[in-house]
């Protein structure tokens, strides 16, 4: 009976070990003058994710959000948050692991990062900022497609060069 159990594949395991703020910054380079003007901001959100293996089956995932609000030509505020998590992930295929690190984990981290950004903006006495949900699955699929297209292009160039 023990031999049968050892031969079966291990069930996938996913555990959140820790969620934490890795880095945080809020700047209002044109204050207090920016508070005297009519508030018609243009808000830009940039986000990035990265992951690193810490130990066997243990990974750190970092979600970086940069929110820039411009009022006319002037920067009203710049908010940067790096929300991180340590995740124990086991029993997944390489493709499933890549999806977990590139989409599932950032999806877990985003509400924490969104709350941090909202809190910083409020402390800067700016109007409430609600960041829309992000479809990390779609972003990850786009990233995979771009990598595949790049690999195919590189293979075609190599084939042309050897011909």
Curated annotation (Swiss-Prot):
Subunit-structure text: Homotetramer, a dimer of dimers. One homotetramer interacts with 1 SecA dimer.
Superkingdom of source: Bacteria
GO BP annotation list: protein folding; protein tetramerization; protein transport
UniProt-annotated location(s): Cytoplasm
Cited InterPro entries: SecB, SecB-like_sf
Gene designation: secB
Signal peptide residues on this chain, from the entry's feature table: none
The protein's name: Protein-export protein SecB
Single GO MF annotation: unfolded protein binding
Keyword check for Protein transport: yes
Its job: One of the proteins required for the normal export of preproteins out of the cell cytoplasm. It is a molecular chaperone that binds to a subset of precursor proteins, maintaining them in a translocation-competent state. It also specifically binds to its receptor SecA.
HAMAP family, A to Z: SecB (MF_00821)
Family statement: Belongs to the SecB family.
UniProt keyword annotations, A-Z: Chaperone, Cytoplasm, Protein transport, Translocation, Transport
Classification via NCBIfam families: PRK05751.1-4, secB
GO cellular component: cytoplasm
SUPFAM superfamilies found in the cross-reference section: SecB-like
């Amino acid at each position: 009976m023990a031999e049968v159990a050892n031969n079966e594949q291990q069930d996938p395991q996913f555990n959140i070990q820790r969620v934490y703020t890795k880095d945080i910054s809020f700047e209002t380079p044109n204050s207090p003058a920016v508070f005297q003007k009519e508030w018609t901001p243009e808000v830009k959100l940039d986000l990035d994710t990265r992951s690193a293996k810490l130990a066997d089956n243990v990974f750190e995932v970092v979600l970086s959000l940069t929110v820039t609000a411009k009022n006319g030509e002037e920067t009203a505020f710049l908010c940067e948050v790096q929300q991180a998590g340590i995740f124990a992930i086991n029993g997944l295929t390489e493709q499933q692991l890549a999806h977990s690190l590139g989409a599932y984990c950032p999806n877990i981290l985003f509400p924490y990062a969104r709350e941090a950004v909202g809190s910083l903006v409020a402390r800067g006495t700016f109007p409430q900022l609600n960041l829309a949900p992000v479809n990390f699955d779609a972003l990850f699929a786009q990233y995979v497609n771009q990598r595949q297209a790049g690999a195919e292009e590189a293979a075609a160039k190599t084939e042309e060069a050897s011909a």
